[in-house]
Regions:
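Substrate-binding/gating loop at the entrance of the active-site cleft, primarily
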Residues: 1-9
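Short beta->alpha connector loops at strand-helix junctions that form conserved
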Residues: 14-18, 138
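Active-site C-terminal subdomain of aminotransferase-like
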Residues: 66-69, 76, 81-171
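Conserved PLP-anchoring active-site segment centered on the Schiff-base-forming lysine
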Residues: 1, 24, 168-170
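Conserved beta-strand scaffold positions in the cores of enzyme catalytic domains, especially
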Residues: 11-14, 101
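Catalytic P-loop NTPase motifs of RecA-like helicase/translocase cores
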Residues: 1, 49, 72, 77-79
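Active-site phosphate-binding strand-loop segment of PLP-dependent enzymes
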Residues: 17-71
Length: 171
């Protein structure tokens, strides 16, 4: 995520890991000088290095206060965690908190590629126009798409629930 952000812009601000108050201070400082430009707060739903997770509702509340959008990368837990496989967004009942959700098909779904889900129409249009070169150069093959679909059907089934429960019991 950090490398992608650096490739996109030099205007990046960091705050302490899982530190909602630190994020609030950072956004307050940014908004003191800039009330117009968009701010994108990026987090993972599950940080793989230490298996910790942010409070998505708290992040969303701070984002709303400072007119920022919240992007949640659920690559590490989507399909693998929670009774329904919705990861920490589901466990925290926070599916409606993220403005943008991104994820990977290379983990739970055993393929390559990924997805992006966008709530805001303006952000959707922005991505449509400014990501066109990526869209047409990295399309999933029909076999990869079928593999993802088959894996998703397992994730959403009773078999998927049983497998996730068994996995959690083994930890």
């Amino acid at each position: 995520l950090q490398e992608g952000a650096r490739a996109a812009t030099g205007n990046i601000h960091f705050h302490g890991h899982l530190n909602v108050k630190g994020l609030e201070r950072r956004l307050q400082k940014i908004r003191q000088n800039d009330m117009e430009n968009a701010i994108l707060v990026v987090t993972e739903s599950l940080f793989s290095m230490h298996s910790d997770t942010p409070d998505i509702h708290a992040l969303k509340a701070v984002c709303d206060e400072y007119n920022a959008s919240l992007l949640v990368d659920c690559a590490h837990d989507f399909g693998a965690i929670g009774d329904d496989g919705l990861g920490h967004l589901g466990l925290q009942n926070a599916l409606d908190c993220a403005d943008i959700v991104i994820g990977s098909f290379s983990k739970t779904f055993a393929s390559n590629g990924g997805f992006i889900a966008v709530r805001n129409r303006a952000q959707k249009e922005y991505l449509k126009y400014y990501s066109a070169t990526q869209t047409f150069s990295n399309a999933l093959s029909p076999v990869q798409a079928a593999s993802v679909q088959a894996a998703f059907e397992i994730v959403a089934s009773q078999e998927g629930r049983d497998r996730r429960r068994s996995l959690m019991d083994n930890i």
